[in-house]
């Protein structure tokens, strides 16, 4: 199992899908730096805040791509996050079956070991692909903007005292941001494994790849039209939006990991590849 996991991780990290995913995410991150962070940096250099002391200078925690739910690049990034997470290795099982590679693998190792290694590699590579552009954008924000504690009034965020870890955001914003980076990593891993678990449903790779995106899109639309936008994974993974109840990420994570692992393992063990 250890050796096959190393092999799968090497395939995931060195594949074209990983490069493409990070490239797309980084382009969005750079666009956000140009449209939001640099103008905020220039605004901080003026005397505007001396004339209006009630206002606070732009801070890194509020201005980076996930610091405010109102910026376009951040919305696009988190909307297509399932695709970004699936590009590196989400379709790898589908490709192994189509190309006949899986037959050779099954003659050298146990099915369960291969499937577990595949699941773990897809989960980790999906999380890494999503986290790299986010950390890049956050670092750009920290380089150009001060790491000030945000204000509860007149800020770019929409956090209220009802939000989870509300006080931490306004006292230690980077600790709060790090917590959300972990959540973003986990959700990206889950979306990659959703892609993995539906490899059995279609004969077309593109259908397998975009399936997680449409799952999130449908959930987002339902949350929007029912006026429960706080439940949409497009928003609650963003620190600038916040989490209104602790059970929201718990439900997503528990159901996401358990269902995808169960379906992938059960279907994978029974799948006739010979």
Q: What are the roles of these predicted feature ranges?
A:
Residues 1-26:
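Aromatic- and glycine-rich beta-strand/loop motifs that create alpha-glucan
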Residues 17-18, 110-112, 116, 204-209:
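Membrane-helix interface segments
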Residues 21-26, 205-219, 256:
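Central hydrophobic cores of alpha-helical transmembrane segments
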Residues 24-84, 90, 94, 119-192, ...:
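Secretory targeting signals
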Residues 37-45, 138-150, 204, 224, ...:
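Transmembrane helix-loop junctions in multipass membrane proteins, especially transporters and channels
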Residues 92-125:
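Helix-loop-helix units of permease transmembrane domains in multi-pass membrane transporters
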Residues 197, 254-274:
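Junction motif at the cytosolic side of a transmembrane helix
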Residues 202, 209, 222-247:
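Extracellular/periplasmic helix-loop-helix junctions in multi-pass membrane proteins
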């Amino acid at each position: 199992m250890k050796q096959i996991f190393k092999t799968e991780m090497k395939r995931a990290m060195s594949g074209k899908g990983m490069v493409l995913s990070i490239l797309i995410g980084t382009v969005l991150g750079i666009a956000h730096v140009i449209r939001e962070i640099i103008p905020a940096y220039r605004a901080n250099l003026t005397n505007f805040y001396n004339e209006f002391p009630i206002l606070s200078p732009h801070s890194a925690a509020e201005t980076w791509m996930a610091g405010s739910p109102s910026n376009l690049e951040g919305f696009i990034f988190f909307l297509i996050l399932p695709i970004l997470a699936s590009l590196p290795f989400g379709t790898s099982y589908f490709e192994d079956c189509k190309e006949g590679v899986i037959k050779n693998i099954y003659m050298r190792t146990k099915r369960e070991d291969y499937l577990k290694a595949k699941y773990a590699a897809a989960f980790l590579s999906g999380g890494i692909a999503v986290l790299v552009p986010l950390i890049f954008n956050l670092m750009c924000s920290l380089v150009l903007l001060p790491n000030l504690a945000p204000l509860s009034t007149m800020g770019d965020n929409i956090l209220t005292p009802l939000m989870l870890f509300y006080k931490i955001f306004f006292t230690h914003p980077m600790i709060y941001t790090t917590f959300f980076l972990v959540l973003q990593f986990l959700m990206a891993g889950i979306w990659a494994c959703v892609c993995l678990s539906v490899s059995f449903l279609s004969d077309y790779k593109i259908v397998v790849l975009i399936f997680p995106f449409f799952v999130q899109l449908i959930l987002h639309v339902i949350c929007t039209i029912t006026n429960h936008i706080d439940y949409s994974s497009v928003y609650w993974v963003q620190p600038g939006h916040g989490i209104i109840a602790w059970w929201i990420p718990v439900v997503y994570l528990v159901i996401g990991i358990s269902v995808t692992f169960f379906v992938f393992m059960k279907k994978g063990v029974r799948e006739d590849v010979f």
